[in-house]
Amino acid sequence: MGAGPVGLIFSLLLAKQNKNSHLLELRKKNDAGSDNRALALSYGTKLVLENLGIWALLEKKITPIQSIHTSQKNSFGRTLLSAEEYNLPALGYVVSYGDLSKALKEEINQSSLVKISYEFEVSAIENKEDKSILYGRTKNSPLETPLLILADGGKNNTDLIQNLKRKETSYNHTALVTKVISEILPNNVAYERFTSMGPIALLPNGPKEFSLVWTGKDIDIQALAKTKKNVFLEKLHEHFGDRVGRFLDCEKFITFPLRKTVLEDFPKSHIVVIGNSAQTMHPVAGQGFNTGIRDAYALSKLMNESELAHIGSESFVSTYYLSRQSETKKTLFFTDSLVNIFSNDLVGLSITRGFSLSLLDNFRPIKNFLVNKMSFGK
């Protein structure tokens, strides 16, 4: 369930194994194509997309990140990570949600092994000893499967699954997302700036624009979103500083609350939860989407290594979750640590942050850890 990028990539991974899949999507057919939200793709995600033949379809729509500049407002200390330093073609890549979805669907349209049903509203899910049964409000219902994959972002169907429990914790933060144009061109550099109003991330998105993600306390970001464009651009410059010059223009703001979600319990057979349906995290480290792709890859790999009759069994489901447990916990801990350290404006902590950024810039093992975490989730 779910025909977003994670669900689409999972189906293409199965098609590579000559396995059939049926994607069920609540939205209309072309809804995702106009979605301009920026996705930060890790190098590991690029390798998955290359393997599926998607990268060639996307290459002209993707902006590589060659270096990442991290600093703190009104404080010493900064860190610079460079792809060249680690013999990587890029530290990451930026693409719009809509462009990625279009490329994935273009590839799926060439496959007879993947079917997509749009505007499919699920009314009930029943788990039997040997299968999962899904009921919809359409004539194509019910549907039976040995393995039901929930990859709908956790928005629509989690309440329908018995024994599926998720723990949700609010960060009491809101994210503001838009595109901005600055005096100095991006030149494939991404910036992370820690400020008293929360972290500001600028991701190069094309030759002339940055995608901006500004996260902070709910009350601060909600007030910011109500300001006029010229006032907002001045505020952004005030907090970000002069590194890209003044900000000249921006698009319409999108805001959304930030929450951490983790699985506490799940059905023991015939249902697996992946992507944002399984876990959501703060965007400060850019790990959420890429963790979902690693979920999809790990599950498809396990299916490829398993006997057909074993897929969906209790031992199969248990093996999958155990294979993802360690990395997911480490990624959530890593992300939460960044939030706690860099979203707190206490004076003592601010000094510690400045020292940490200086230390990081001169201590290769920590930089190696960061690059591996960003690139491969390790």
Q: Which residues fall in each region the model found?
A:
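C-terminal helical "tail/cap" subdomain of flavin- and related membrane-associated enzymes
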Residues: K301-K378
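N-terminal glycine-rich dinucleotide-binding loop that anchors FAD/FMN and/or NAD(P) in oxidoreductases
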Residues: R37-K60
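Conserved N-terminal helical subregion
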Residues: L47-N51, I62-I161, T169-T174
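Conserved FAD-binding catalytic core of PHBH/FMO-like flavoproteins
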Residues: L49, N140-P142, L147-G245, F253
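FAD/FMN-dependent oxidoreductases across multiple families
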Residues: D220-S315
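Pyridoxal 5′-phosphate
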Residues: N127, P186, G292
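Glycine-rich FAD pyrophosphate-binding loop
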Residues: L12-R37
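Glycine-rich Rossmann-fold phosphate-binding loop(s) that bind the pyrophosphate
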Residues: G2-P5
